[in-house]
Amino acid sequence: MAYRKRGAKREDLSQQHERLQEKEIENNTDVTMENKNNNNNRKQRLSDKVLSQKEEIITDVQDDIKIADEVKKSSKEESKQLLEILKTKEEHQKEVQYEILQKTIPTFEPKESILKKLEDIRPEQAKKQMKLFRIFEPRQLPIYRTNGEKELRNRWYWKLKKDTLPDGDYDVREYFLNLYDQILIEMPDYLLLKDMAVENKNSRDAGKVVDSETANICDAIFQDEETEGVIRRFIADMRQQVQSDRNIVNYPSILHPIDHAFNEYFLNHQLVEPLNNEIIFNYIPERIRNDVNYILNMDMNLPSTARYIRPNLLQDRLNLHDNFESLWDTITTSNYVLARSVVPDLKEKELVSTEAQIQKMSQDLQLEALTIQSETQFLAGINSQAANDCFKTLIAAMLSQRTMSLDFVTTNYMSLISGMWLLTVIPNDMFLRESLVACELAIINTIVYPAFGMQRMHYRNGDPQTPFQIAEQQIQNFQVANWLHFINNNRFRQVVIDGVLNQTLNDNIRNGQVINQLMEALMQLSRQQFPTMPVDYKRSIQRGILLLSNRLGQLVDLTRLVSYNYETLMACITMNMQHVQTLTTEKLQLTSVTSLCMLIGNTTVIPSPQTLFHYYNVSVNFHSNYNERINDAVAIITAANRLNLYQKKMKSIVEDFLKRLQIFDVPRVPDDQMYRLRDRLRLLPVERRRLDIFNLILMNMEQIERASDKIAQGVLIAYRDMQLERDEMYGFVNIARNLDGYQQINLEELMRTGDYGQITNMLLNNQPVALVGALPFVTDSSVISLIAKLDATVFAQIVKLRKVDTLKPILYKINSDSNDFYLVANYDWIPTSTTKVYKQVPQPFDFRASMHMLTSNLTFTVYSDLLSFVSADTVEPINAIAFDNMRIMNEL
């Protein structure tokens, strides 16, 4: 009927359009009597409508929805029915358009990507090192003669491997914080030297050294003409030493003493632990191990060299559910998407045939044909896809503790009756408060109160009691009041299982007995007289209840099936299931609940073992990564505090922490939550390994500064030009190697107090001042760039008399405000500058002091996926039993 009227609607519209055009032409030519008549007629029609007692239904004008004349003449119920169908169709079109729109908005992220991000979080397999950890590397530097020209000889010094300081104003302390962050990222969980060892090319007997970088250093030193013969002979003898009885091997390595300290620490504090069959079996969640529906078997015995890294599964260190609405919403959303992917599907073969069921329902409703009666909409929207979607939504929302909101039409009594099953089975906490109140109020005012002839409930917004709680006190019927009492007290029970907080369902729901309570209440309601309502109304409600009560057995089975799937998958969750209402909600249509209630068959559907293992692995990996990133962030915050960078770096540290969790859209997180997160992180203790590593850096800051080409240990400032000195490493440069004879002021103290008067007085008295402290500087050793910035005539003689490429002029910038300091500054060819950089000589490379023997296990194998050793199968689904040792689905 709904679609047959579309032609009439279009016809009406076209006729209207023609009439309007004719009126416009007439108005242009003659604007008198007809206009007045039309106005009078319109006024008359309006007054008739206002004074008329005949009810007329007015709808929105969207999509030009109009009601044909024949429909207006039909009964009130038929009008409402047609309107509902048209409205439903319109809303469906809107939803489709909204989905299309969402996919075209660039900022929208499809949920598949969240799932991929979660599944891509792997255990720390990436931290298996193929090289030793190094901050330093030996480098050959030329020696400069007295006249500033290079010699052919070279000398070896320890320099920084990554000497990266950004341009401009930059605090050296930030360099050390970034270095520490880098070490935390690269810090290996275990070191197996045998895996990284490479052949020593210069060895006499095909010996091996610890890694490729050691081999390259040995190669370069061996080929250096100035290397002593004894060192060459030593390199030729460098090889590994195996002690097979103790399962250890020693490898020679070339390392700076600080790098040696780092690698020794990593070797002595490895995270690997022995692995055996018992550990793997205990790794499987206990409830799945003890579930008789799953048959688990170990495929093989593990060798004694098997190792694994124990996942870090500490609970609730940040309590993100408490006062972090945006973060908690993102976590629950990602958990919901993951949970939906593992909840088993109710395929069409496992459900009752939709056509057959609708036909049976039509017979139960005594519909000879699908005429427009209020009962016809009971059948609207029933399909297997909606049933499956509802099943997955309910279980996934409970697993992720994600709040649901209910979408329903008050006039569809079947939806409301299905909603009564939903509210009976799912705890109240799972629904948005406003949505729960609206649904309960609709059930009370449409079904419960009319049955007993009670007046409509007028619910005050903000009332602490829900409509069901108010109704429980007012209804005298024992069965109905008893059912309302159960719903009002239906909450999750919080139980700690295997150290994890679980939200468990009431035992009456788990075994399905609560459905009998629901049916008793429904039967009582259907027997009532509905004294204040028409007979048709009573008949519609009774038939809706009949449809649901005819499926009593299936509803008991459905309730047991939902409970079993929820509890089995819940065993794979490793993070505490904290329950807090989420900012955004998952929409649940009550028509899809009707589909599930009406189409559920007698086929048992339980998660496959592979699905359970996958869900468990993803949960463990995310949880472990979450805790490791917390440890990193806590360590960096502590380091920033001790380096006096607390205020400067704090927000970026928290942002990095969230980015590394991979599921957060960091720019959208409100600042207040960022700072609250900082406060929580600040209260946590630093993990031992990370603290020891930071102390190693702190103790050796000066050595690291000396090895950098971009960090100075101080600066000398004079009022008049100072003559540059020859330096063996750089030629004529404005570098001072000692501070003898200079008055020294601590740079940090100066910056803290801000009292520069002392410096000014000294400079005016022509006394050079030495500001001592680490500071960055910029170097440019290109002759061309210097000539480009200065008068070329200054360099004319030098260019003429010497080879330009033998010189190494250096330009130093202490910070973005300082002057530039050049090699040549006057016409006497005596290099001068008003500023000198105080730079200590880097540590010379001494082969004997740099050769270290490192010891590790000869061999072991680290396994990351422990569950790959377990083969699993299930019993025949029809025989699957629930916690009470009875079949999940009894209705056969």
UniProtKB/Swiss-Prot annotation:
Entry's localization field: Virion
Post-translational modification: Sumoylated with SUMO1 and SUMO2. Sumoylation of viral proteins seems to have a positive role on viral replication.
Renumbered residue ranges of the record's region Hydrophobic: 406-426, 434-454
Region (Disordered): 1-48
Gene Ontology molecular function: RNA binding
Site description Interaction with the intermediate capsid protein VP6, residues in chain: F234, M238, M851, M853
Stretches with biased composition (Low complexity): 28-41
InterPro entries: Rotavirus_VP2
Region (5-fold hub): 1-90
Alphabetical keyword list: Capsid protein, Inner capsid protein, Repeat, RNA-binding, T=2 icosahedral capsid protein, Ubl conjugation, Virion
Amino acid composition bias (Basic and acidic residues), ranges on this chain: 9-26
Cellular component GO terms, alphabetical: T=2 icosahedral viral capsid; viral inner capsid; viral nucleocapsid
Family, per entry: Belongs to the rotavirus VP2 family.
Comment text on domains: The N-terminus binds RNA. It is necessary for encapsidation of VP1 and VP3. The N-termini of 10 VP2 molecules form a cylindrical hub underneath each 5-fold axis of the inner capsid.
UniProt subunit comment: Homodecamer; each decamer is made up of two conformers of VP2, called VP2A and VP2B. Interacts with a VP1-VP3 complex. Interacts with the intermediate capsid protein VP6. Interacts with NSP5. Interacts (via N-terminus) with NSP2.
Its job: Inner capsid protein that self-assembles to form an icosahedral capsid with a T=2 symmetry, which consists of 120 copies of VP2, with channels at each of its five-fold vertices. This capsid constitutes the innermost concentric layer of the viral mature particle. It encapsidates the polymerase VP1, the capping enzyme VP3 and the genomic dsRNA, thereby defining the core.
Protein name: Inner capsid protein VP2
